[in-house]
Regions:
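Long, well-ordered core segments of solenoidal/helical folds
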Residues: 1, 26-52, 101-119, 163-181, ...
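Carbohydrate-binding/catalytic loop surfaces
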Residues: 1-3, 7, 49-72, 118-139, ...
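Well-ordered alpha-helical segments within folded domains of soluble proteins
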Residues: 5-21, 72-88, 135-151, 203-219, ...
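Structural helix-adjacent loops and short alpha-helical linkers that scaffold large soluble proteins
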Residues: 19-33, 87-106, 112, 149-166, ...
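Active-site cradle of extracellular carbohydrate-active enzymes
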Residues: 32-126
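CBM-like carbohydrate-recognition segments
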Residues: 133-225, 246-263
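N-terminal basic, low-complexity leaders that serve as flexible interaction/assembly modules and, when applicable
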Residues: 227-260, 266-278
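Membrane helical hairpin/interfacial module
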Residues: 265-303
Length: 303
């Protein structure tokens, strides 16, 4: 009966997979599976794939003010982020790995489907009127979870990137304040509370942590080779290098590549200097130029 609330899944699941990695003791993986099965039995809504915060909030015993199922955003954020961290460390041949993969994917699908048009998720995710307005901690955890899934090949970028774009727009332009603080974070709690004020001044350390978690994963996404606009940068390199190289080849460097400088440039009284000022530029271009020629447009540029 250890894992009876959603926060606990984030707190303990990743620790168990880390302990397995450190010790090699398979007991940690056995108990990981045993305990999550227990958690599912008391707080997983199998119809939606979402988690209730704990057994007190299971429908129909508990309902929102509109009579709907009440799924707490930060609670499901803990779970999605926790599953991402677990998958990172689970061995490829673990007998229950597909169980965790399917759980993660289904939860991601369920969460993405109920995003608000403004990019955030409300505190009660399936009933925006119950406690209306944005909530940052849950939104940030979801954003991290989606980005991790794309970065590691579990989620379809074409499906989830639009969701991430809207969520990050909210996080970067609304949640992040001009003074660097992270607002719209629901205080410590366990449910969406009608009438509770959550505004730009509402801050909490777990909101900041979730924001940073999402931001770091977004940087990893942006730094992935397939997301770099190689064609743009290669074209820019070509435009910088071509005039220099063509004049060098024709022996016209000093004639055609004069550069005006300050009279006291480098301590020397010169009106012009030759290619000295292009040295660093060309040093930066050189690694690209040394790549082999090929039949691509980029290869022909180098040729």
């Amino acid at each position: 009966d250890y894992w009876w609330w959603s926060d606990g899944l984030y707190m303990v699941m990743p620790v168990m997979t880390k302990l397995y990695k450190v010790t090699g003791n398979h007991l940690y993986l056995d108990k990981l599976y045993e305990y999550i099965v227990y958690s599912d039995s008391i707080m997983l809504d199998r119809e939606t794939g979402l988690y209730y915060r704990d057994a007190k909030y299971v429908y129909p015993k508990h309902k929102t003010s509109s009579g709907k199922k009440d799924f707490w955003a930060r609670g499901d954020g803990w779970v999605l982020a926790g599953l991402a961290k677990v998958l990172k460390d689970l061995p490829a041949d673990y007998e229950h790995r597909s169980f965790f993969v399917n759980k993660y994917v289904k939860l991601a699908e369920a969460v993405a489907a109920i995003q608000q048009p403004e990019g955030y998720w409300t505190r009660s995710m399936m009933d925006p009127t119950h406690a209306p307005g944005p909530e940052t901690s849950g939104t940030a955890f979801f954003t991290y979870g989606f980005l991790w899934g794309i970065n590691n090949g579990y989620l379809d970028e074409a499906v989830y990137k639009p969701v991430i774009d809207k969520a990050w727009n909210y996080l970067a332009k609304t949640a992040l304040q001009k003074n660097g603080k992270i607002g719209y974070v629901q205080p410590i709690g366990e449910k969406a509370i009608p009438g509770q004020v959550v505004d730009a001044d509402s801050e909490a350390n777990f909101g900041v942590g979730a924001f940073l978690l999402a931001a770091c994963e977004y940087v990893r996404y942006l730094e992935a080779p397939e997301n770099q606009d190689r064609a743009y940068w290669c074209n820019l390199l070509y435009k910088m290098a071509a005039p220099v190289l063509s004049n060098m080849a024709e022996g016209n460097l000093k004639k055609n590549m004069l550069v005006e400088v300050s009279p006291n440039w480098d301590g020397r009284n010169k009106g012009v200097t030759y290619m000295e000022t292009f040295g660093r530029l060309m040093a930066g271009v050189a690694p690209w130029l040394t790549l082999p020629d090929d039949d691509t447009e980029e290869g022909q540029m180098r040729k």
